[in-house]
Amino acid sequence: MPVLLAVGTQNKYYHLGKGIVVLMECSLRFSLAGPDGMTIKADDAKARLEVDSLSLVANDGTSHFFSLRDIVTTRSQDFRIEATMVNGQSLVLFKIGDKYEDLAKGINRSRNEQLIRDLLMQEPVRKQSVPGELRMGAHEEQKPLICKCEVRVYQSTVAIMPEKGEFIRLPLSNLAGVSVEKFSLTIRKEDGSFLTVGKLGRELEPLRKAIADGMAEQTLRIKALLKDLVPEADPINIENASRLIKEGKAVNLVLLDQLVPGSWMAMEKRLEGADLGPQYQLLTSLGIKEKTRVGIKRTRSEEGTTDYIWLFVPITSTSSGKAGNAIAFEASSEDDTGRATYFFRIAPREEFRRSGAEGESFADLDRILDRTNAALEAINFRREPIYLEEGKLYTPEYSRYRYAMMKVPELRDLRARFIGRVIHSDPLQWATDVSDLLSFNVSAKDDDQRWAKKEGEPNE
């Protein structure tokens, strides 16, 4: 079913049949230019904004169709709406009359809704949209940015959609707290920054509660996981650990064991139970065991509780048979099928050839592990956006990933560092393929080269 959106102060949308929902129509003039800046077409036209597209029917009978996923940036100013496309074309809409504000807001809102659908992948909603006024950079020495917005709370994320500009995603695991201050909602992030939403009216307290409840539920899940992992653990240790361990973020096994003694051994047993034992043993024998990170995310559904477990193992050795410059990402859940191990470069290949594990990239390995985790969190741990070939991103089936890649720099970085994936066939074949991939990685010259199984050895 299509998503129905309201544009402007009056909910004017209508159906054209076959699932097409028109948000608004208006007359205007447009100018379309190519990547070289030369005008391709300029004419008066009738514009039609739909849930996922903008179309123009010119006076001479020609038409132009623009998917919202193909629009990279928009800017509305001085009664003109300017948009740049993924193919380098630029579009200017003007002479819109009294529909200017509605069209500008409608395009921005529709693009934000599209991006939310693409990134959050149908994640359940805790609290439906609440209108308010966003204040950012509200420090004494800064002039705050103020604009109207909508706030929506999902299962693991707070989404803020400014009236002008792209939506702001705030994972609950990145939040330090939420409070009511001077009749406004203040959301504080772990990095020390914050933003404020005012003019919420009667929705102020319900919105605060929805965010606070989501944060509390995540913390309780972490505590339950730790207690389940080490039943004899001291409650004080679990309480202290829950302040540092966040859902969706992998934690160093050494640190975890310091916070909750016995958790390292218990986690190894848990990995064995999740059929990750052989992978864990081999990868940590190749990599730096004390730098290994593990993450657990517990999800609940009608079928019961599922633990999603993942590993990051940095492999940095330059010795024969263990050549590294890679981070191994291994993941599984109880209902997972078609498992694979994913590998990402740590350093540019030229740097590794020149300096080995003494290069500057390896000196900041923890930051690179953090960056890899953040990228996976940004795409809700979906793996398809990582390994799909560039050409497939332009097919209708995977267009949502193309839009996400344009808008999420962490995903672009992850794809740029992606070496390849090794499918779990049988243990011996998997180990052979891992060795082959690592050897390829240290011998390849260009950073954009990816590993693939030899012809006749399917990796699907």
Residue ranges and their predicted role:
Residues 3-460:
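Eukaryotic intrinsically disordered, low-complexity regulatory linkers and tails enriched in Ser/Thr/Pro
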